Amino acid sequence: MSAQQPSAQPAQQAPATTQAPTTESSSSNSNGNTPAPSTSTTATSQSSDDSLICRWNQCSERFPSAEALYDHICERHVGRKSTNNLNLTCHWNSCRTTTVKRDHITSHIRVHVPLKPHKCDFCGKSFKRPQDLKKHVKTHADDSVLARSPQDPNANLGPGAYRGHASKAPSSYYDHNGHVRTNSSAFGQPHHHQNGHASYYSHPPAPYGGGMYYQPPHMGPRGDIFGHPGAGAYDSRKRGYDDLNDFFGNLKRRQFDASSYAHVGRSLVPLHGALSVHTGGVGGMAAEYMAAPPPSSSVSMGSAGPLAQHYYLPPMPSLRTKNDLEQIDQILEHMQSTVYENSGSSPGAHYGSGSGYDMRHQSPVGIRPPMSDHYGQQQHSPMTAVSSSHGGSPAVTPPSSNLSYTSGHSPGASSAALSPSSRQGSSISYPTLPAAAGSSATAQLGSNFSSVERRLSGGILQSASRDRERESSYDGASTPRGPESVGSPSACSDASGSEPESYDSWVQNMRTIEALRDLVRERLRRGQYDDVEESVNLPPIKTERPDEEKPLYPSLRMS
């Protein structure tokens, strides 16, 4: 048995030795059956090698990469102005393109060199110049607007919120040909990308742990970052804040007369649109501007978006100390009294006497008729009265039964529609015309004043008419009024020659001054001022010097 075992082992090794040549022969057969590389691959590699040859005149130098070829052309053939070898004409084959700057010629060389460093993040296509990539990205934006489906959850992001995709990713929004894929389920995750590439425009992080595509109910159809009006509102409020600071600075420097109604009106005009008195006053302008998030609802994914942004306004230099606030409050009180005293001049002096109606009271000021019979009798105009609103500012009330609308005193559509008999009962001073026989004017409801059909008094100068009206106002008023103070000759000319302020402007001025005083008083109440007062510059003290004794003889100075 022991003798048979050694003989069996060589028998078992024999097939193994016989199999080795067969494997070698098979491998040799497989190597022999491998097809040769195709001619198309060889042609492609040859064409790529030919594109890396410099064709500038007779250079014909070969380079390993497109970057090396581009650097060679820019440094060797184009040159630089500093080295005095700048060439602005392209000599690639027969191009002969001439430019005016070195940047232009280097950008033009990219057309000939197969260098495409600018790659599209959506489809992976490369471009030679950045302007070509920019035009290509616009085509993606147009396709996303035209081909977006109604069920697309990203529809509210607008055309500017692009997604990031790879050139070969199966879940990309665009395929290699630029067509939109139907698999839109892969775009529900906004913060990571399966292909590992970043998006062209990065998405903001979702605040408060909410969903990315949650749309607040009070916003428009655009996305959260595009529909947020915080920055534009802050700019407008900043402009109003600057106007308010300039106004307070002019008050401190006394650049206009607070006792002149014309000066006060002109100084308040820039603040009418900036203060927004009708929509909340100036309280919000003094404090910080904060866009608050919408109220929480029962929806679990509802988030406030990026609305929780704070915009802090800079400190107001003109209202820095307590002394500034008290001084400006006194000036505003003086301005308010000036506007309040000039309330009777609002309804236009060209249409009647400028002081025939006092807008501060319910009852008009009685004025006796003038001495002459050639002028109509003075009577109050049917202007509405002024009452105080909840905010302390005057408001307009509906017209009451101040006039009995009879056939003799019915207001016409304009001053031209009044009959001679009714003109005596109106507030317009015209010469009395002879009564025409026939029917009187039809009773209508309308205004007694017409801004278009303005007429001047005939037979008398305007200056004499104003003097007569002023005398009549002094004689008829229960309390004689003092002469209107004018701060400067320019203000006198403005008050006499220009059109008087309308009733709406007077009300707006009153509301503006009241809102400014509320702002100043609120700052004083809250203590929003610096405790350190400004150093007061005292005038220099004059001291008398003793008279020096004059010498008996004049002294000669040696030069």
Curated annotation (Swiss-Prot):
GO terms (BP aspect): positive regulation of transcription by RNA polymerase II
Its domain of life reads: Eukaryota
Under the heading PROSITE patterns, the entry gives: ZINC_FINGER_C2H2_1, ZINC_FINGER_C2H2_2
Return the Pfam families for the record: zf-C2H2
**Which residue ranges have biased composition labelled Polar residues?**
375-391, 487-496
Instruction: Quote one Gene Ontology molecular function term.
Output: zinc ion binding
One GO cellular component from the entry? cytoplasm
Where is the motif (YPX[LI] motif 1)?
430-433
Basic and acidic residues bias spans: 542-551
Region feature (Disordered): 1-47, 181-202, 339-430, 459-505, 527-559
Query: How does it get modified post-translation?
Result: Activated by C-terminal proteolytic cleavage by signaling protease (probably palB/RIM13) at neutral to alkaline ambient pH.
**Which residues form each disulfide bond in the chain?**
none
Q: Where are the zinc fingers (C2H2-type)?
A: 52-77, 88-112, 118-140
User: Which keywords annotate this record?
Assistant: Activator, Cytoplasm, DNA-binding, Metal-binding, Nucleus, Repeat, Repressor, Transcription, Transcription regulation, Zinc, Zinc-finger
- List where in the cell it is found: Cytoplasm; Nucleus
Amino acid composition bias (Low complexity), ranges on this chain: 407-427
InterPro entries xref list: pacC/RIM101 (IPR050806), Znf_C2H2_sf (IPR036236), Znf_C2H2_type (IPR013087)
Q: Where is this motif: YPX[LI] motif 2?
A: 553-556
UniProt cross-references to Gene3D superfamilies, sorted A to Z: Classic Zinc Finger (3.30.160.60)
Report quaternary structure and partners.
Binds to DNA. Interacts with RIM20, which binds to the two YPX[LI] motifs and is required for proteolytic processing.
Instruction: Describe the function of this protein.
Output: Transcription factor that mediates regulation of both acid- and alkaline-expressed genes in response to ambient pH. At alkaline ambient pH, activates transcription of alkaline-expressed genes (including RIM101 itself) and represses transcription of acid-expressed genes.
Recorded family membership? Belongs to the pacC/RIM101 family.
Q: What is this protein called?
A: pH-response transcription factor pacC/RIM101
